[in-house]
């Protein structure tokens, strides 16, 4: 994956802001040859892994990328029900066992306008707080376990603004709210199945739809079903 000088400077600047050590797991389709010295992957997996490796390189040891193969690690593939590759997994860091809680499932390209929102999400994952953290924590008692699916594309003007919002909800709620990010161009079959005609398109618990741009407060209203507690800071 060829990263421009400008992108590398952006990555370096953002990775310097990492707070705690974190691990990202990425599922690809690599096959190790007989000498166990070389791995072959599809172009899509190579592109995503190239960016992730650059993040790891510039993280000063705070980010570790763990690569698993749907072909060579079938137990993990089945455990996490991996359907598409590459898939990046953000998981709960509370423990180090083999069943870490899933927070975010990222099946999207990291290039172009999707790079910055991904970097922001990584920072939140490391412990950097979004300004609306208190609102989310205050309202967790009013939110049932939820799943958010966000459909995006590289040419979408508003997607970079909503990606960090939904991801921060998953991270701050420690998985009470699970998020999946799907690129409609990379996965047109999934977009067609859900009848996605424009992006960003957000689906909450497989029934509530948000079209276009929204704020953290808008998402809270939908997750709490209108019962939002306004006592939190920045309400």
Please report, for each region that a protein language model flagged, where it lies by residue.
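Acidic, two-metal ion nucleic-acid-processing modules in DNA metabolism proteins
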Residues: 47-60, 67-68, 103, 110-112, ...
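N-terminal leader/targeting and pre-domain segments
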Residues: 1-23, 113-144, 228-235
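Non-catalytic, surface beta->alpha helical segment in thiol-disulfide oxidoreductase systems
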Residues: 90-128, 203-235
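N-terminal beta-loop-helix "entrance" segment that forms/cooperates
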Residues: 34-42, 76-78, 190-193
């Amino acid at each position: 994956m060829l990263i421009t000088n400008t992108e590398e400077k952006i990555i370096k600047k953002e990775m310097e802001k990492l707070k705690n050590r974190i691990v990202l797991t990425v599922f690809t389709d690599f096959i190790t040859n007989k000498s166990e010295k070389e791995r072959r992957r599809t172009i899509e997996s190579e592109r995503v892994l190239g960016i992730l490796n650059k993040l790891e390189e510039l993280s000063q040891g705070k980010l570790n990328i763990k690569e698993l193969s749907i072909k060579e690690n079938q137990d993990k593939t089945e455990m996490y029900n991996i359907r598409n590759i590459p898939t990046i997994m953000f998981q709960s860091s509370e423990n180090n066992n083999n069943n870490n809680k899933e927070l975010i499932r990222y099946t999207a390209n990291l290039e172009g306008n999707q790079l910055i929102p991904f970097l922001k999400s990584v920072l939140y994952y490391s412990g950097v707080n979004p300004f609306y953290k208190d609102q989310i924590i205050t309202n967790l008692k009013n939110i049932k376990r939820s799943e958010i699916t966000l459909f995006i594309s590289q040419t979408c003007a508003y997607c970079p603004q909503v990606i960090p919002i939904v991801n921060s909800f998953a991270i701050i709620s420690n998985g009470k709210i699970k998020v999946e990010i799907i690129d409609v161009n990379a996965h047109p079959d999934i977009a067609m199945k859900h009848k996605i005609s424009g992006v960003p398109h957000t689906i909450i618990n497989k029934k509530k739809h948000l079209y276009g741009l929204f704020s953290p407060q808008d998402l809270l209203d939908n997750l709490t079903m209108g019962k939002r507690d306004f006592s939190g800071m920045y309400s």
